[in-house]
Amino acid sequence: LDKIVIEGGHRLEGKVRINGAKNAALPIMAACLLLHGPSRIKGIPNIVDIQTQIKILKNLGGDIRHIEDGSLGIIFRDGEHKEKITAPYDLVRKMRASVCVLGPLLSKRGNAKVSYPGGCVIGQRPIDLHLKGLKALGARIETDEGYVIASAGTLKGTRISLKGQYGTTVLGTCNVMTAAVLAEGTTIIEDAACEPEVQDLAYFLNKAGAKISGIGGSILTIEGVKELHGVDYEIIPDRIEAGTFMIAGAITKGEITLENVRNDHLVATIEKLREIGVEVTANGNTAVVKSNNTYRPANITTMPYPCLPTDMQAQFMALLCTISGKSVIAEKIFPDRFIHSAELRRMGADIRVDVPYATINGSPFLSGTHVMVSDLRAGAGLVLAGLVAKGTTHIHRIYHLDRGYEQIEKRLSKLGAHITRVSE
């Protein structure tokens, strides 16, 4: 196992190119199950979650190749591998998004056997809304020894609400959308997730011949079609990776230019950084983050898009820990998502958690120590804290980080961080 070692206190400067969005790439790769003919998908990051998804799709009969320009060629040959319908536990347990093969398998092969998903341990994330939506389209669903077993004759369009206890469901919307594109008749999804990654899947499917309207809103209308064809498509840039690098610039009082960003997907993050006192200049597909001033504490509430994403909460917590004064974070998506606060406290942060709130009494003095990563974004928060902590920070269990960030230590090092990856 590897760990990351950071010597804090170095200002970051320079340019960084943002990769394609992991959370758009995973459902789009799964949706290739629906297509007749080859697809070429550009901008897919080289991270562990993508490697896991490639294994799952190969298991289902996919022919997947890395193309020289960094894109991925994916083809499922019609008529072959109809019997391959299983996404096994040993792969699915590694990441939650692997459940998004359920809709395409059911739609294209009439059967699916998918293990209950894994991923990061951040509280209740059930898939009941996925199953409710698929049942409404006519699927028969049972569970057996940790597997969802789904079967269907012809799926039929209907009206479905995906509203749940915790609001909308991103992967549930993806699963129902991919199941509905080849269904008979029209499907209306109410309370659909509006996240850019859901929009990206819809645009991808439309390019392949689907008829989806209302993209970006909470009501999606899907007219079923007979067939979808292969396409060339470029994934949107990763708004969470972009936000993470923005905070890296802010927390070290540096100046970073981000290239390949969609600033329209980053409005809430940019607005909050400006409120804190960070200078952010968003222009076309670049953004420049710099700071000369004193920062102000802030209150943050995580909510579904277009509000501040829960996946940026740990990174903002790290920043707020370094700003004198009282800040409050309200975590409205995953109320238990504060595991990283205990590790930040080890570094000297003053954080009190009273779910779903965390109250931070910030001060500019964090100290390096040994900390452990509990989940992907918590890992990013600890790296950011390590960049400014006095002394040396050792970050253990970084396999969580590798699930979502490609070579984060090399990219931060290029910006001037004193950061290395070493074997434990």
Residue ranges and their predicted role:
Residues 1-424:
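Short, structured segments at the rim of ligand-binding sites
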